[in-house]
Amino acid sequence: MGFLIAYVFNLSPCSGDEMFETIGLAIIHFEGLNTNRVSKCNQNWHQESKQVAMELIQKVSQGLWELENCDTVNSVVVLGKEYPPVPEQRQEERHENGVNMFQHIFTRQGRWNEEFLADVHTRLHFTYRTRFVPIPRHPNGPSPMSISVMLRDNPLNVIENVLNNPDCFQTDIGWGCMIRTGQSLLANALQRACLGRDFRIDDNAANEHELRIIKWFEDDPKYPFSLHKFVQEGFSLSGKKPGEWFGPSATSRSIQALVAKFPACGIAHCVISTDSGDVYMDEVEPLFRADPSAAVLLLLCVRLGVDVVNEVYWEHIRHILSSEHSVGIAGGRPSSSLYFFGYQDEHLFYLDPHKPQLNLASYQQDLDLFRSVHTQRFNKVHMSDIDPSMLIGILLNGKDDWQLWQQHIASSQIIHLSDSKPVDLMLDHQLESAILGDRYLSEDGQGPSSKVDTGDYIDVGSFVPCTDSSCKINESEDEYQDVKCKNQRIVVVGETTTNGSPEVEVEKVLVEKETIPVRSK
């Protein structure tokens, strides 16, 4: 029998004052522990402990007291709104105004622009939740019980989950942070679309229209943007099992699908790019021709470096966040996502989802629910310290916004506008969709499978839209090809023709074995 007691501290992030807070206490009870199994568990324990330690280090950087403004020179920007800095008061002025050392430590008043603080406080912020409607574990997926959960959740919640739902997830601690930052991005886009950019909350009275948006994210399968719906779409579209960490691509696919299934949300369309910052005019302009006032959400998954963000992109990240059309960036650190909503000089402001709270349905009063998704605590990180993989959100409220935004990002090195998707890229995406997109349960019913194995040759000829002027089938140029090809075909893209489309030729090709024909829809 044994006990492990873990204390978690916060450290003030600004200045050299070492101020600590015990923000968590976890007591783990080991009864009847088989010592012969300890060595077998060491590796898994080490990996999970390492992840927990990284999260704790991140928390230590946040501080018990609110973030102080150490920069009194540079202005601050929140999703396209710029606020001037507040010069630091001299010590004697603080005394004259009755601001003693105690108040200096425990308050931020006078440190930040008050309008800036009101804007930050208005941002919708979703975090880890506990005790929500159970999500069944996938047979081949992660276990609901992990070191992260045992250390960070309330011990009573852990015990209750073990006793009542041992094969279900009732918290997303340790794996749901990218989903939560994706929810934050989507929620702030919905807030902007429904209430406008100048909307500000009253901390003493919940706004009825915003409450409706908040409840769409309640962690129950019946709500359109719940964690459960994200997990469901993540499995269907990206093969993500419950308990597995999402990346930007899986998150963007889930958001796109959920928005399409709930047109009453206020966003008419969601256009995504899962591998670049490329936006294609022929995908967006038809949406505004059909409805000039349509709200369109763009989600761009980009990678701006290998291990860290390349410095050449720093200014362009600031430029994106300075746009009035920006609804934030979901990203952060490897396996530890943050929601970025603004910047000051070379630091990005963010909201951290790694704070466990009770699920939204547990709040009896609307005001308590409302306050659980609005925080006055935020932090900042230098751009050299963030992960290069991120999800950029842009909201265009109608055709006029679309035209203004095009001008704003004309010089961007991250986002690029093109008339249409290149033919070779279209073929890549069509092949990917044919091979991976139509997922279905395998024979054992355990998970998504594909009709094509990765080792097979693929006949791509059927994917090419042929016309008399732009495409021709080269059946056989010599006897050797005609005998040995077995009807396998490749696509050859030639010069652009006079009508603007590339000349496409489908040829037979010699390979080692028969291909598997994959038909386009």
UniProtKB/Swiss-Prot annotation:
Pfam families: Peptidase_C54
E.C. designation(s): 3.4.22.-
Active site per UniProt: 177 (nucleophile), 352, 354
Keywords: Autophagy, Cytoplasm, Hydrolase, Nucleus, Protease, Protein transport, Thiol protease, Transport
One term under GO cellular component: cytoplasm
InterPro entries membership: Papain-like_cys_pep_sf, Peptidase_C54, Peptidase_C54_cat
Localization of this protein: Cytoplasm; Nucleus; Preautophagosomal structure
GO molecular function: cysteine-type endopeptidase activity; protein-phosphatidylethanolamide deconjugating activity
GO biological process, one term: aggrephagy
Catalytic activities: [protein]-C-terminal L-amino acid-glycyl-phosphatidylethanolamide + H2O = [protein]-C-terminal L-amino acid-glycine + a 1,2-diacyl-sn-glycero-3-phosphoethanolamine
Matches recorded under PANTHER family: CYSTEINE PROTEASE, CYSTEINE PROTEASE ATG4
UniProt similarity note: Belongs to the peptidase C54 family.
Function: Cysteine protease that plays a key role in cytoplasm to vacuole transport (Cvt) and autophagy by mediating both proteolytic activation and delipidation of ATG8. Required for selective autophagic degradation of the nucleus (nucleophagy) as well as for mitophagy which contributes to regulate mitochondrial quantity and quality by eliminating the mitochondria to a basal level to fulfill cellular energy requirements and preventing excess ROS production. The protease activity is required for proteolytic activation of ATG8: cleaves the C-terminal amino acid of ATG8 to reveal a C-terminal glycine.
Protein name: Probable cysteine protease ATG4
Organism this protein belongs to: Eremothecium gossypii (strain ATCC 10895 / CBS 109.51 / FGSC 9923 / NRRL Y-1056)
Lineage: Eukaryota, Fungi, Dikarya, Ascomycota, Saccharomycotina
